């Protein structure tokens, strides 16, 4: 029963991480109306990032109790406090708490599942990460129908309930033997993956408009892209678990095919399907690093993911519109070749 309780707690913790990520975009209209211009929101994002970096660092510690329940408690307090913040500067410390708690929740929420079910690590980590997508998708929908304060009160209450569910969670396991092989190919792969995922979500809409498609259609396809990303994690988990790196390379071949079709006006509309094939990549790489290198390596994985998701989409801003599909294809090809190298590294070790 304890393992089921911890599994439920991990699922809800990752759901709340999705809420944290989606909250600024979903709440921005309310913030603009209450606080005025959007320029002050930079304080929120800076504090959130600072808290996230520290939270991931603390999450590298093997001691899961009381760190994970405390992280959830801090997030609950931040959610409850946000409606009472009179200005952006007052929101900043609450954003710091969201980042601090969210970083620890992301590391331990994932790693706990992998340790509870090591023989099904790849499959269950993919499926439990569907929770993140649900949180990110439901946040704007909920804020469209609920008052801002009511939604945050519910989110805060859920964080406290989840904190109770993970009380007494066991410490992270140390590797039974010294890790063999290089970690860097896996870190670089995660950075390229998050960069590709973010660049597709941010810039392919611009490319569709350059091809003559309506802005509204681009928004619909972007929603489908995120939906397919979650479905890929859910539906492909069992297949990927049988031979993870080989399966990921096969999925990337499909992604490259779709990104070649992305050059043409009509077939470019198929790009959301790339989300379905990309879905299992992050959780599978997380599972492989956890099994091979242990819990302390997971912080580096999270930092690599954060760097890729920030830097690579930013570099796409330097490309002309016609360079967007070429850049996306080049990223997918580089990731495919890197995974081939990682597979050879595993065989040698």
Give the positions of each predicted feature.
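Intracellular juxtamembrane helix-capping segments at the cytosolic ends
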Residues: 104-117, 279-293
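A late C-terminal transmembrane helix in Major Facilitator Superfamily
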Residues: 294-320, 328
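C-terminal ends and interior cores of transmembrane alpha-helices
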Residues: 74-86, 254-264
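C-terminal transmembrane helical hairpin of 12-TM major facilitator-type secondary transporters
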Residues: 246-285
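Extracytoplasmic gate region of multi-pass secondary transporters
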Residues: 24-25, 182-230
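Symmetry-related core transmembrane helices of the 12-TM Major Facilitator Superfamily/SLC fold
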Residues: 149-166, 324-340
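Cytoplasmic helix-loop-helix junction between adjacent transmembrane helices
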Residues: 96-130
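Central cavity-lining transmembrane alpha-helices of secondary-active solute carriers
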Residues: 43-59, 223-235
């Amino acid at each position: 029963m304890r393992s089921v309780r911890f599994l439920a707690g991990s699922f809800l913790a990752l759901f709340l991480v999705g809420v944290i990520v989606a909250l600024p975009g979903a709440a921005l209209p309310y913030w603009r109306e209450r606080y005025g211009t959007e320029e002050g929101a930079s304080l929120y994002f800076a504090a959130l990032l600072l808290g996230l970096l520290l939270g991931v660092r603390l999450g590298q510690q093997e001691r899961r109790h009381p760190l994970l329940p405390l992280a959830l408690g801090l997030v609950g307090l931040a959610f409850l406090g946000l409606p009472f913040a009179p200005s952006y500067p007052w929101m900043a410390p609450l954003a710091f708490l969201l980042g601090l708690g969210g970083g620890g929740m992301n590391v331990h929420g994932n790693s706990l599942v992998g340790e509870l079910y090591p023989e099904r690590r790849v499959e269950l980590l993919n499926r439990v990460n569907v929770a993140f997508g649900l949180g990110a998708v439901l946040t704007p929908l909920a804020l469209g129908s609920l008052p801002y304060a009511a939604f945050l009160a519910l989110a805060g209450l859920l964080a406290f309930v989840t904190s109770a569910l993970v009380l007494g969670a066991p410490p992270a396991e140390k590797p039974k033997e010294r890790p063999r092989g290089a970690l860097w190919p896996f870190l670089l792969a995660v950075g390229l993956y998050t960069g590709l995922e973010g660049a597709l979500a941010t810039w392919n809409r611009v490319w569709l408009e350059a091809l003559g498609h309506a802005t509204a259609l681009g928004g619909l396809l972007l929603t489908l892209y995120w939906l397919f990303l979650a479905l890929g994690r859910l539906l492909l988990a069992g297949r990927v678990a049988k031979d993870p790196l080989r399966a990921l390379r096969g999925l990337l071949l499909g992604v490259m095919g779709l990104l070649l079709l992305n050059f043409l006006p009509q077939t470019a509309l198929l790009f959301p399907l790339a989300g379905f094939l990309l879905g299992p990549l992050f959780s599978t790489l997380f599972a492989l690093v956890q099994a091979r290198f242990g819990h302390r390596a997971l912080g580096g994985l999270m930092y690599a993911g954060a760097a890729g998701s920030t830097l690579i989409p930013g570099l796409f801003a330097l490309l002309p519109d016609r360079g967007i599909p070429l850049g996306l294809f080049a990223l997918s090809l580089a990731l495919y070749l890197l995974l081939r190298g990682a597979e050879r590294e595993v065989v040698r070790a």
